[in-house]
Amino acid sequence: MAVERTFSIIKPNAVAKNNIGAIYARFESAGFKIIAAKMLHLTKEQAEGFYAEHKGRPFFDGLVEFMTSGPVMIQVLEGENAVQRHRDIMGATNPDNALAGTLRADFADSFTENAVHGSDAVESAQREIAYFFSENEICPR
């Protein structure tokens, strides 16, 4: 398997409930290396740009409002088959459908406030990483 990078967000609801450490522990126990991380309070423009592919969909405005409601943690994870493994650890988008022990089953509050975001493909991971991080902010180890 190839070593990949994926992009991850711990969303405002999980940050507000002090779940950052618990989520990071899950990443590391799953074998991921956290090679970049920072806390941000997204602006409306940042959130709209990041989620631009969803513009015009019924949930877009609520998603932008939620993602700008408080600080988020953004990180780059590195590991074997990182994109798919991160998605598996996150669980289903709808926490009602997420398997027990996944991040969304354990930390989500609702479909929108579902605790975490993760890239859905290697190509989107590259785009999402570049949206928030410069090369000198990424520290392979």
Swiss-Prot record:
Cellular component terms (Gene Ontology): cytoplasm
SUPFAM superfamilies the UniProt entry points to: Nucleoside diphosphate kinase, NDK
Keyword set, alphabetical order: ATP-binding, Cytoplasm, Kinase, Magnesium, Metal-binding, Nucleotide metabolism, Nucleotide-binding, Phosphoprotein, Transferase
Alphabetized InterPro entries for the sequence: NDK-like_dom (IPR034907), NDK-like_dom_sf (IPR036850), Nucleoside_diP_kinase (IPR001564), Nucleoside_diP_kinase_AS (IPR023005)
Keyword ATP-binding among record annotations: yes
Subcellular locations according to the entry: Cytoplasm
Record field: transmembrane: none
Gene Ontology BP terms: CTP biosynthetic process; GTP biosynthetic process; UTP biosynthetic process
Binding site for ATP: K11, F59, R87, T93, R104, N114
EC number(s) given by UniProt: 2.7.4.6
Top-rank lineage group of the source organism: Bacteria
Keyword field contains Isomerase: no
Reactions mediated catalytically: a 2'-deoxyribonucleoside 5'-diphosphate + ATP = a 2'-deoxyribonucleoside 5'-triphosphate + ADP; a ribonucleoside 5'-diphosphate + ATP = a ribonucleoside 5'-triphosphate + ADP
Record: active site: H117 (pros-phosphohistidine intermediate)
Major subcellular location class: cytoplasm
Cofactor: Mg(2+)
Any one Gene Ontology molecular-function term assigned to this protein's record: metal ion binding
NCBIfam families for the chain: PRK00668.1 (NF001908)
Family note: Belongs to the NDK family.
Function summary: Major role in the synthesis of nucleoside triphosphates other than ATP. The ATP gamma phosphate is transferred to the NDP beta phosphate via a ping-pong mechanism, using a phosphorylated active-site intermediate.
Subunit structure: Homotetramer.
This protein's name: Nucleoside diphosphate kinase
